[in-house]
């Protein structure tokens, strides 16, 4: 049995370790090594491939999480197989896109990402119906224990990140790269910031249900909103604010590491349930969702890709009106 004091020490130690890891990564980039696993192509294609990685992480999280949750629901509705297929396709497309150095959109990946996003939207509708059809409608009890509203939204985000990556490839030769009508860096930054806030809302709801019994449960409701705020502010203010951008990158890196650490904490939560991992078939379904936290990592990678685009845009005279 883990005591509350031990949990506090674990939370403090983990936060310190994540901060040091983020600082180390920050210094690593300063020495000119670029983004982690950075390709050797131009900035726009580099950012597109980083978005592919983010989309793949989100797709992996959704595939595993929906498999567990829908298995628990005995796949009563045959539509419950759809997110498994869509997330698997998104994962395969993202893996191929991460290896693709071409500066133009794929005719295969692009429609897969659109289909993935649409599947997530339809899934959100199904989950909303599942919540509202129960006695009490949109009550706290139903939000806690009915179909999670945020789960299919992660599939929407996977599709969005992938779609943005393909749009970036198409604009890589343009003098003024734009995505969805906005400068590419600004567009990707705002999308990633919105995704971080939405994912935080889902984590906050479930951690509130768990009464924040582990102090580390406060991390995913504090670091990602801070990362989203700094990222959006960096995109909407003057590129001369170097300290702001430095802080934004640092918190995004912290959030990226936090996503993987969160999976470890969820594994600990499963181990603390009755029977622990010996009773894995039950505890994987009843305990905290093991595949969920890396969604933060995927969105943090998207934020870092946005920063590389923002830095590139800073050097272009035609964007200086945007300070």
Regions found by a protein language model. Name each.
Residues 1-323:
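Short amphipathic, positively biased membrane-proximal segments
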């Amino acid at each position: 049995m883990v005591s509350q004091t031990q949990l506090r020490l674990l939370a403090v130690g983990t936060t310190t370790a994540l901060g040091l890891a983020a600082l180390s990564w920050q210094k690593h980039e300063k020495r000119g090594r670029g983004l982690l696993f950075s390709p050797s192509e131009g900035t726009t294609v580099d950012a597109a491939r980083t978005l592919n990685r983010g989309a793949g992480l989100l797709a992996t999280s959704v595939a595993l999480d929906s498999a567990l949750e829908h298995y628990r629901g005995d796949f009563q509705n045959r539509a419950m197989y759809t997110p498994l297929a869509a997330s698997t396709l998104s994962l395969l497309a993202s893996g191929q896109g991460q290896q693709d150095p071409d500066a133009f959109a794929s005719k295969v990946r692009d429609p897969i990402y659109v289909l993935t996003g649409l599947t997530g939207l339809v899934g959100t509708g199904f989950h909303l119906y599942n919540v509202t059809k129960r006695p009490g409608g949109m009550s706290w009890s139903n939000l806690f224990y009915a179909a999670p509203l945020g789960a299919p939204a992660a599939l929407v985000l996977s599709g969005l990140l992938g779609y943005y990556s393909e749009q970036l490839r198409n604009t890589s030769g343009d003098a003024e790269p734009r995505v969805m009508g906005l400068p590419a860096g600004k567009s990707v930054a705002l999308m990633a910031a919105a995704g971080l806030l939405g994912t935080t809302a889902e984590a906050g709801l479930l951690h509130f249900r768990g009464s924040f019994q582990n102090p580390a449960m406060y991390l995913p409701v504090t670091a990602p909103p801070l990362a989203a705020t700094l990222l959006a502010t960096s995109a909407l203010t003057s590129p001369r604010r170097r300290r702001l951008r430095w802080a934004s990158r640092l918190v995004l890196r912290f959030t990226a590491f936090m996503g993987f650490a969160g999976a470890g904490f969820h594994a600990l939560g499963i181990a603390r349930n009755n029977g622990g991992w010996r009773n894995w078939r039950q505890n994987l379904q009843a305990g905290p969702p093991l595949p969920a936290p890396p969604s933060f990592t995927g969105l943090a990678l998207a934020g870092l890709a946005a920063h590389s685009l923002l830095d590139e845009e800073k050097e272009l005279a035609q964007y200086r009106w945007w300070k």
